[in-house]
Amino acid sequence: MKKIVIATRGSKLALWQAEHIKERIMQQYPDSFEVELLVLKTKGDIILDVPLAKVGGKGLFVKEIEEALLDGRADIAVHSMKDVPMELPQGLTLGAIPEREVPTDSLLSARYDGLDALPQGAVVGTSSLRRQSQILAMRPDLEVKWLRGNVQTRIRKLMDGEYDAIIMATSGLKRLGETAPFHSELGPPLFMPAVGQGALGLEYRSDRQDLAEMLAFLDHRPSRICVEAERGFLFGLQGGCQVPIAGYAVMTGDNSFELTGLVAELDGTAVIRRTAAGTEADARDTGLTLAAQVKAAGADAILQRVYENGHASPQA
């Protein structure tokens, strides 16, 4: 029986995602493979006392995992697509993208039922400049406070009273079955998700054609098309996952989609949003074109201010 090693981070959510892919492989190929997990710590897991946007560098949550692929310790890596840099290391490729989980964000609170119920000056926790900029655009009277840690840690801090509300990805909450006394979704078109949010991606060495064929059953074409368009938009802006950039594509037909991209000032005082239509064949190019439109509307100046003020680094 052939052994397959899946590299993953050690958080509860990352382990859930890796176990999910492991189970799918074993269901598809019963008695064909022995599947093991290789649990690794990444830079993003180790540095917990600094906001992610200020840590800098590419691939905060993937670099160590990619090294395991390149040196042969692992065969497959399971990533949250929002954490995957636009440019992969030489010798690696992104293969199947399984069906995407809901891409929205969620507002959790112990006392307040939704964004409108938060009192003036309420403290909202998030680790994301994208979430910060959008929540302040909707409610400039709120105070945004830095929040790091895994899903359970963040919810514990909320319940301990450190925050009046926190914002987290809905997909992670659903996968782990976590919530809070009050839970409301923040989603498109009012609140835009990160590029690739809710989607998983499988990475492996480019010379492993056997893995490309073996994992093809996991690929969900609509999810792949949409994520490819979103990543084209992010690449066109030379942005990483720790910047105030949002992008979300939705299928409008079997081969067509609509992509919306957003860049916002950190204090929410300016929000640039544009939409474009595309097809599977030009998914990435549609994202690049939309990025150029957003740049022309002022996004370049906004992102430059973010970088100059040390809030984030390009291509994080």
Swiss-Prot record:
Its EC number is 2.5.1.61. The modification S-(dipyrrolylmethanemethyl)cysteine is found at residue 241. One of its GO terms (molecular function) is hydroxymethylbilane synthase activity. Pathway: Porphyrin-containing compound metabolism; protoporphyrin-IX biosynthesis; coproporphyrinogen-III from 5-aminolevulinate: step 2/4. Coiled coil: none annotated. The keyword Kinase does not apply. It comes from the Bacteria. It is an enzyme of class 2 (transferase). It catalyses: 4 porphobilinogen + H2O = hydroxymethylbilane + 4 NH4(+). Its cofactor is dipyrromethane. Keywords: Porphyrin biosynthesis, Transferase. Binds 1 dipyrromethane group covalently. The keyword Transferase applies. GO terms for biological process: protoporphyrinogen IX biosynthetic process. It holds the Pfam family Porphobil_deam. PROSITE patterns: PORPHOBILINOGEN_DEAM (PS00533). One of its GO terms (cellular component) is cytoplasm. Belongs to the HMBS family. The porphobilinogen subunits are added to the dipyrromethane group. Monomer. Tetrapolymerization of the monopyrrole PBG into the hydroxymethylbilane pre-uroporphyrinogen in several discrete steps. This is Porphobilinogen deaminase. The lineage of its organism: Bacteria, Pseudomonadati, Thermodesulfobacteriota, Desulfovibrionia, Desulfovibrionales.
